[in-house]
């Protein structure tokens, strides 16, 4: 099942997601959000959706796969942004000396933090956090923080880079399970296309690696020079 708290037809996701095998729900197609304003609330989406598949797993033992596409952190990050406004007090208290755009960005993205907090609480309450894997990544750096006058991304990241630096376009992939005994950091260069083969191997799934462009980032024979760019 897949969820997106924006218009379900945007970018034709109502066509692509079913072709990927998902039962897809978005605004206008079965996802009924209660918090008004743009961008919409990730916490609201999680509260409306997670209890059903968690309860089903507890009752039947049937594994679930839920795909979420977040929208709460979407630009722009003035106080007119619904999520920035919703979490303004917390962001300003945490970063009182930050510029307004940076405060607004943090405030908007706190909504995803709250959504994940809620999800983990529900998984732990159901006793299945140790049997759950969460895979999370982003699509791009917050380029809307860059204006003609000020590069607020430098303030946010603490790096004196520019849009011409490759380092700005590096991303992070978070893979978590409640059963992890300790954290693992992988510094091997990799790309989004490496996620599927890596997770497939961790789950012990059989697949033809010739049909996947990526590599398992934990593989001992991983050649970083072949990483996708």
Where are these regions (language model features)?
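Solvent-exposed soluble domains appended to multi-pass membrane proteins
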Residues: 1-229
